[in-house]
Regions:
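A short beta-turn/loop motif at secondary-structure boundaries
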Residues: 22, 58-61, 129-134
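A conserved helix-loop-beta module that forms one wall/lid of the active-site cleft
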Residues: 1-27
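Short, structured loop/turn "capping" segments at alpha-beta junctions
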Residues: 13-17, 47-54, 120, 174
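Conserved protein-kinase catalytic-loop segment immediately C-terminal to the catalytic Asp
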Residues: 16, 68, 127-130
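A short glycine-rich, hydrophobically flanked beta-strand micro-motif that places a catalytic Asp/Glu
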Residues: 56, 119-131
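Protein kinase-like catalytic core scaffold
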Residues: 15, 73-76, 122, 138-141
């Protein structure tokens, strides 16, 4: 199954494999070959055959960007440099967050990604394109229960306060 999924990606190794239940960079794997892909999938399914897996094209980068979206607006952003000796950029894994200003295109694409999952409170993670002004970023993940670790440090904002104030306002409540 994994090899069939890889073939549909229309890419080359290495690829990124993610378990859909992971967080903070746990369950994210760098897969270098078909043999490795097969072995990793066998190991994961031996532990839990109901584990959902996602394969993504590997895009080399020095950093990714996390965008917190709240109520259809960008709340805060941070640049997450790739950890030395690793391919991940999660703050929980050791990345040191930095401030970043998004382009209009990056804002537009982040809001579009959040809207695609009907997210009121989401984080959109992306790898910026080479030409940030003219080419859309590569969205790599949209989180419906986002971590905010490092965001206050990078943005200088009181994220928790802003989230509480948003949801305390009844006009922002969503009917279910």
């Amino acid at each position: 199954k994994a090899v069939l999924a890889f073939d549909k990606l229309d890419t080359k190794f290495p690829v990124i494999m993610k378990t859909l239940r992971g967080s903070k960079g746990v369950g994210v794997l760098f897969v270098e070959s078909e043999k490795s892909l097969d072995s990793i999938v066998q190991l994961i399914y031996k532990q839990d055959e109901d584990t959902d897996l996602l394969l993504q094209e590997y895009i080399p980068t020095d950093y990714d960007v996390r965008v917190l979206v709240l109520g259809g607006k960008v709340l805060a952003t941070m640049k997450r440099p790739v950890i030395e000796g690793d391919f991940r950029s999660n703050v929980s894994q050791g990345s040191k967050p930095e401030k970043i200003k998004l382009t209009e295109l990056e804002i537009e694409e982040s809001l579009k990604a959040a809207k695609a999952v009907n997210g009121v409170w989401t984080a959109v993670d992306f790898i910026p394109s080479k030409n940030r002004e003219k080419e859309p970023p590569f969205v790599i993940e949209v989180n419906s229960s986002p971590g905010t670790e490092g965001m206050e440090e990078a943005s200088g904002q009181n994220i928790s306060k802003e989230i509480i104030e948003f949801f305390a306002d009844k006009k922002n409540w969503v009917k279910v």
